[in-house]
A protein has these predicted regions:
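Glycine-rich loop(s) and the adjacent beta-strand/alpha-helix scaffold that form part
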Residues: 1-36, 158-159, 163, 216-224
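Short, well-ordered loop/turn elements at secondary-structure boundaries
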Residues: 120-122, 160-161, 191-192, 211, ...
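A glycine-rich dinucleotide-binding beta-alpha-beta segment and adjacent secondary-structure elements
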Residues: 138-204, 232-245
Length: 289
């Protein structure tokens, strides 16, 4: 079934237009949790989690901007929830063969959790506001590709969700990525000049991973246009350097996520010395004044 993100069409022929030049493509999968109406939730039956007020910055050069912290909540699934989910597994694309690609190891769907850890009587769920001006909540920990009626029936067995209203169900998709070993350390393609690839399309997963690649690709795209030496970061300079070096030298066989354990210089790559490591390099590029 072709499709993009919810309510969006699939992107047809884009991959084919790239692979015909010799760039290798593969498939991975990802999923997203259900979005729920916060007005239908019994908050008194959950534990609260307050935001952090002790902010630590990476740089002293910009004015402090305190983001308003919103409260989150936690609760747990139970055996009744798991039993409904188990009965629905034949309808899950992740388990009936419709989706066969590899997904993020550290963001398993709720179906995967109950199958992989059948001895666990409960799994934690986190309710996260989607913004200051909406009642919509992101139900972290309940990523699913099951039909909506099964998702809703299972969730209603959680005491705090007995009157739950769902805005959008969780769902899973397969997507194309391109072999990152065909990229330079600048994230420019070795095959197509001036084509830069960054983010999930390189086989990574995660916001910071995508953002880190994006800034390096953007810097080097600008350098290609206006002239200058290619900009790269070493494994001893930044986690971005570790990430990109792993991608372009080792490649990926599952969605890649950055960990401190991947960095042999992790004692040097600290939050408290980020400004000393990177400010001078950013200044020479004109990124800071």
């Amino acid at each position: 079934l072709a499709g993009g993100r919810i309510a969006e069409p699939a992107s047809y022929h884009l991959t084919e237009s790239i692979t015909r030049h010799g760039i290798i493509a593969g498939r991975m999968k990802t999923g997203t949790p259900v979005r729920i109406d916060g007005r239908s939730v019994h908050y008194e039956l959950m534990e609260t989690q307050d935001g952090e007020n002790d902010f630590h910055r990476f740089s002293f050069m910009s004015e402090p901007r305190k983001l308003k912290q919103l409260q989150c909540w936690t609760c747990f699934t139970n055996e009744e929830v798991h039993e409904i989910l188990r009965k629905g597994l034949p309808d899950s694309p992740l388990f009936n063969g419709q989706i066969q690609s590899i997904g993020p190891r550290y963001c398993p769907s709720i179906e995967t959790k109950i199958v992989t850890f059948p001895d666990k009587p409960q799994h934690q769920l986190f309710l996260e506001p989607e913004g200051e001006t909406t009642q919509e909540l992101y139900l972290n920990g309940f990523s699913s590709s099951l039909p909506m009626d099964i998702q809703l029936a299972a969730l209603k067995k959680v005491p705090a969700f007995k009157d739950l209203v769902v805005y959008r169900p969780g769902y899973a998709i397969e997507y194309d990525y391109f072999d990152p070993t065909q990229l330079k350390h600048t994230l420019e393609s070795k095959i197509i000049k001036n084509l830069f690839l960054a983010g999930q399309v390189n086989g990574t997963t995660g916001y910071e991973e995508a953002g880190g690649q994006g800034i390096i690709a953007g810097i080097n795209a600008d350098i290609n246009c206006h002239g200058g030496e290619p900009f790269t970061l070493g494994r001893d300079e930044a986690y971005i350097g570790v990430l990109i070096d792993d991608l372009v030298t080792k490649g990926v066989d599952e969605p890649y996520r950055m960990f401190t354990s991947r960095a042999e210089y992790r004692i040097l790559l600290r939050q408290d010395d980020a400004d000393m490591r990177l400010t001078e390099r950013a200044y020479k590029l004109g990124l800071v004044k």
